[in-house]
Amino acid sequence: MELGNQPGPGNRPEIELEWYQYLQNTVGVVLSSYGWYILLGCILIYLLIQKLPQNFTRAGTSNHSTVTDPDEIVRRQEAVTAARLRMQEELNAQAELYKQKQVQLQEEKRQRNIETWDRMKEGKSSKVACRLGQEPSPSTSTSAATKPKQEKQERKTLRGSGYNPLTGDGGGTCAWRPGRRGPSSGGUG
């Protein structure tokens, strides 16, 4: 056996050495440029591979729990229909109560309007001072008609007739002045 003719670890042919150097340079450049990205990508792929089988097993167990028995399907549909009917009846009952309440409120409003109209015909105030079900006392309505006239005559003004809060008259510590006319910044001058 001739040992000189066989390629060994130190005696590689030229083409093999060139290919090895080319591969080493290419891999080295790629790893030096994108090494961290490749590492993070590998970690993400590993985590996804760990999570995906768990999701598939969850989906598989939920598929197994569905019933394919036709009788069970019919029972479930009947239960759903019964629940819908029950909810619809409750909704109809609530709607009926709401309509009755609205009719009652409309009737109360109509009664108040009639009372207001009657009071206006009698010459009394149009505003109803008493609550529903209470009768206004006649003594308060007659004395109230004469009293406001006396109060108006006796009432004295709090400030002088020349008081104007915008001009500052009246002894206040601060006086308001109107601002300059014209644009506040630049413009034609």
Swiss-Prot record:
Listed transmembrane segments: 29-49
GO biological process, one term: intracellular protein transport
Any single GO CC term annotated in Swiss-Prot or TrEMBL for this entry: cytoplasmic microtubule
Composition bias type Low complexity, residue spans: 136-147
Membrane topology: Single-pass membrane protein
Primary location: endoplasmic reticulum
Keyword Nucleotidyltransferase annotated: no
InterPro entries hit by this protein: Selenoprotein_S (IPR009703)
Keyword Lyase on entry: no
Keywords: Cytoplasm, Endoplasmic reticulum, Membrane, Selenocysteine, Transmembrane, Transmembrane helix
Segments of skewed composition (Basic and acidic residues): 114-125, 148-157
Region (Disordered): 114-189
Compartments where found: Endoplasmic reticulum membrane; Cytoplasm
Its job: Involved in the degradation process of misfolded endoplasmic reticulum (ER) luminal proteins. Participates in the transfer of misfolded proteins from the ER to the cytosol, where they are destroyed by the proteasome in a ubiquitin-dependent manner.
Family: Belongs to the selenoprotein S family.
Protein name: Selenoprotein S
Species annotation: Xenopus tropicalis
